[in-house]
């Protein structure tokens, strides 16, 4: 998934823990193979490759993820938009100068969840060059799915951490909640806060590890889909 992943599980027997761990890791691999934009065979690549050409048939799982992406888009007033991944072509690590407003505008014309044609059978990106980036939503979905899978295998204590997207399987063995540290965005090896969770989930992101540096200034990988510029007011 292009990020460190962690699985912590506790079981009464070693064999039970090994079986559950393998099942959980296999499920994580399945999600990556299905939704990674870096794999030619993935559903995400097929959707993007067909932009402006034809609708792509989708299964129930993909439809559920896309419907949830739509909910996030509405609840965030358009700030969470999985069609904004195309802006990574503007803000990439090889840049040595700031992009022009024309370059940003050309890419912004390819952004917009409201442009997408979606049904429970297929999806169509109507403009050639449009792209969906599932990375901002699939990790959360996958973490919840993996935690649920572990519980079906009688795992009652543990957590799933997919690059900062955390889903709790159950509390620690002593029934205490898990302490989840929120990394300080500017001070190395420091937590800005600690949240204790015995159930539920938590998703975090920040620009302290993934960023573009231009003329000595760091620009976050978190990009405002309405302006085309990296966010500055929210570091973590």
Model-derived features: positions:
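Mature catalytic core of soluble alpha/beta enzymes
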Residues: 1-236
């Amino acid at each position: 998934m292009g990020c460190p992943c962690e699985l912590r599980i506790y079981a009464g027997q070693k064999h039970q823990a090994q079986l559950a761990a393998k099942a959980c890791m296999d499920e994580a691999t399945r999600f990556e193979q299905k939704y990674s934009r870096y794999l030619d065979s993935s559903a995400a690549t097929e959707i993007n490759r067909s932009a402006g050409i034809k609708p792509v048939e989708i299964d129930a799982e993909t439809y559920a993820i896309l419907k949830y992406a739509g909910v996030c888009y509405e609840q965030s007033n358009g700030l969470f938009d999985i069609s904004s991944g195309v802006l990574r072509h503007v803000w990439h690590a090889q840049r040595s100068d700031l992009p022009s407003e024309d370059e940003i505008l050309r890419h912004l014309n390819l952004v917009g969840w409201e442009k997408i044609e979606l049904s429970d059978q297929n999806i169509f990106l109507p403009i050639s060059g449009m792209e969906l980036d599932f990375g901002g939503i699939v990790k959360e979905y996958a973490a919840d799915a993996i935690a649920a899978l572990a519980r079906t295998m009688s795992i009652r204590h543990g957590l799933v951490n997919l690059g900062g997207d955390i889903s709790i399987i159950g509390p620690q063995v002593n029934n205490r909640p898990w302490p989840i540290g929120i990394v300080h965005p500017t001070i190395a090896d420091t937590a800005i806060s600690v949240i204790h969770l015995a159930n539920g989930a938590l998703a975090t992101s920040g620009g302290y590890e993934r960023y573009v540096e231009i003329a000595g200034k760091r620009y976050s990988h978190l990009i405002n889909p309405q302006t085309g510029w990296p966010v500055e007011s929210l570091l973590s």
